[in-house]
Amino acid sequence: MKEILQQRRHRLSRLIQSGVAIIPTAPEKIRNKDAHYPYRADSYFHYLTGFNEPEAIVVISGLEGGRSILFCREKNEEREIWDGFRFGPEAAKSEFGFDEAYSIESIDQILPELLGDIDQIFTPVGTGDSWDSRIFNWLNTTRQRTREGINAPDRLVDVRSILDEMRLIKDSVEQDTMREAASISSQAHILAMRMTQPGKFEYEIEAELLYHFKKNGSQYPAYTSIVAGGKNACVLHYIENNSVLNDGELLLIDAGCELDGYASDITRTFPINGKFTGAQKELYDLVLDAQLAAIDQTRPGNSWDAPHEAAVRVLAQGFIDLKLCHGSLDQVLETRDYFKFYMHRTGHWLGKDVHDVGNYKINGGWRQLAPGMVLTVEPGCYIRESEEIPKEFWNIGIRIEDDALVTETGCEIITADTPKSVNDIEALMAA
């Protein structure tokens, strides 16, 4: 892994040419009073360093062969007794392959020296007043040396636009990690299906998911799990997870683990009592057909929008057939009448963040999919109670979501272990 991290830093150094990149990790965050949230490193910082401790900054030079420097906390026996192991600069330098490493306490003295006679600084710009102030302070310190013939950089460039494009294409190590995260999450969804029955609470199902994530090496859930029974599934980001599960209703679970800094993201919808009703099956099969059409369009050379357009066409025609929308397919698409039942996009990038980085459009047009990209494919339909809607469809929310790795010839569904056909779901729940 050290070699992969070094390769990423060297690639960034080539892209910034005669500049210097300065990238901080995330700060620790207080939950309340003396209780902290579990610490997670900043995704950009971790992508380049693999380093998980707070109070750290990486500096990468576009000159001198891509020199990389880590600033981190010193070893401290007393703090390690209370808070746990620290690498310290020397061990971190060796473990993660940096050219140099220093105490974070010395950065105000060392960093201005590194900014002399370079063209520009690459850093996350506008992420917060405190970080911007630190950058300006280092810059001003360098400017004070102009009488010595040392020039300060005169441009600030947001490094995230460069790193976004690097992170968009996953290397083989990232792909393998994401496959493993997907496998853990798939098994968690299977266990959740097996334990679901009327009378249980949503939070009981959530607990099973979180238990399986942690038991299998996941450090955190990738996001707050959605466990939404019945009408709760019509709330796209429902996270209360505190309602009882009712016989005859569906349960929508949107949950995935994070493993070694990489997210998985799966949604399945299934009957609480193990058997779809006729109306539930009609809508479910429609959403599944839309997802399969979108997956078929998830291939290199196709536009980012191609899977979404394919899903929308299938859903719109299905809504017409079920008398939920009225008019021709072209009319429903033009007026976006389908939008009242399907109001979100069909996917997003996936990686170190669950809604991962990378532009969806380039120069005003949808970008083309390419091997190594990972995205979700997640059409759905959400039908609230309304006198205009047949009663058998009221309060049904369905979403089916898989994670797709674009390959040379199409895509690999890395979450395929999770059952999603009506027959497979009913068979699993009956076992």
Residue ranges and their predicted role:
Residues 1-431:
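Active-site neighborhoods and metal-handling regions in enzymes and metal-associated proteins
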